[in-house]
Amino acid sequence: MIDFQDVHKAFGPKRVLEGLSLKIADAETMVIIGFSGTGKSVALKHIVGLLHPDAGDVIVDGQAVSMLDRGGLTTLREGIGYVFQFAALFDSMTVAENLTLGLRRRRELSAEEIDDRVREALALVDLSGTEERLPAELSGGMRKRVGIARAIALRPRYILYDEPTTGLDPVTSAVIDRLMVRTREHLGVTGVVVTHDMRSAYTVGDRIAMLYEGRIRQVGTVAEIQETEDPVVRQFIEGRPE
């Protein structure tokens, strides 16, 4: 379980998180929505210890992330896959080499086991046979799928998705949504998805949380969010200007 406990974070005079509290249950997909600049990606970075709160804490599997030493952070991160907004692939490496980067740090895995994981992960995202291709040879949607495969190959307990459908056409976005749902069904992972895309949020989310002015404005099931009477949440999900 992931538990944000009254998390505060500021960058200089700019206060980004101001009392963020949110519990994410095992095996659920939580979607975090909110206006640009409200701290959604900042919240994700706290889960993996890339940022530390000024006050409060994030508890992952009973451990306070800010209290972990280097070894503890390494162990934590081995159980978390991170899908970046722009895939973050190394252009000079093949698809297979991009997937094996994290796996080669797992000393318990043999070369054969690593190759098997790469093949299995690519098959799960419908990219079998692309192992020797370079990122430049792939479409934007395919690169996003490679990013998901890289996370899957770690066999994590958690996968964090940062704007997974940004920059994609509606058809390709629907493919990515389907892959996120399939990943949860096949692997039983807990997912945290940051997005502005409400169609995607409704498709992949078990629950949706609206982050507004540094804290959670509302959290609920898809149906509860769709039927909300909160004016701020309503404005966002309907895409209405003020």
Spans of model-derived segments:
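ABC ATPase NBD coupling module
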Residues: V65-G81, R105, A111-E112, I225-T228
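Conserved ABC ATPase signature
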Residues: L134-L138, M142
